[in-house]
Structure formats: structure tokens, C-alpha cells
């Protein structure tokens, strides 16, 4: 006979790493070309003028300028870079 009970198991004890999503450069902030403006899953916010879209749906600046968020077609949010 065992003098200690069995260890048992649990289905808890895991957690995923944080993904650090969200806005990285707020509206009316100055950015350089290549600066990440927004990290997201899917295209909740679309790139507008002078903004590019990465393969993981990251929006980044194509030119030096100022970040400007606006409502585009069908009330979808867009991010523009106004060149400085």
C-alpha cells in the first residue's frame, strides 16, 4: 500500500504569450516612413493614403508625416498619413 496519495493531474496551468496588439502611434502624432501605426488581427481599420498593410494586417507609414484617423467608405475606419 502506498503511503502517499497519487499526484493527480490538472487541465489548468497554461497561458498564451501576449501579442501586443493595438495603436502604436496615436492620431496627430508625427511618424517616419516605416513606422508601425497599428497592430491588429484582421482589418478592422484599413490603410488610407500613404499607409501600407503588412501580411499580418499591421498598418505602417509609407512616408514621413502626421497620422490621421478618419471614417472612410461605409463608415469603415481608415488611417491616413499626411506628408510633412
From Swiss-Prot:
Name listed for the protein in its UniProt record: Large ribosomal subunit protein bL27
Annotated stretches, region: Disordered: 1-20
Entry's Gene Ontology molecular function annotations: structural constituent of ribosome
Record's keyword annotation contains Ribosomal protein: yes
A single GO BP: translation
Family: Belongs to the bacterial ribosomal protein bL27 family.
InterPro entries documented for this protein: Ribosomal_bL27 (IPR001684), Ribosomal_bL27_CS (IPR018261)
Amino acid at each position: 500500500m502506498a503511503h502517499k496519495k497519487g499526484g493527480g493531474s490538472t487541465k489548468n496551468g497554461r497561458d498564451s504569450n501576449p501579442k501586443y496588439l493595438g495603436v502604436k502611434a496615436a492620431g496627430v502624432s508625427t511618424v517616419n516612413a516605416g513606422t508601425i501605426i497599428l497592430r491588429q488581427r484582421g482589418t478592422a481599420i484599413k490603410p488610407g493614403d500613404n499607409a501600407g498593410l503588412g501580411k499580418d494586417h499591421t498598418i505602417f507609414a509609407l512616408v514621413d508625416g502626421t497620422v490621421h484617423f478618419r471614417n472612410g467608405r461605409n463608415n469603415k475606419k481608415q488611417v491616413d498619413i499626411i506628408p510633412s
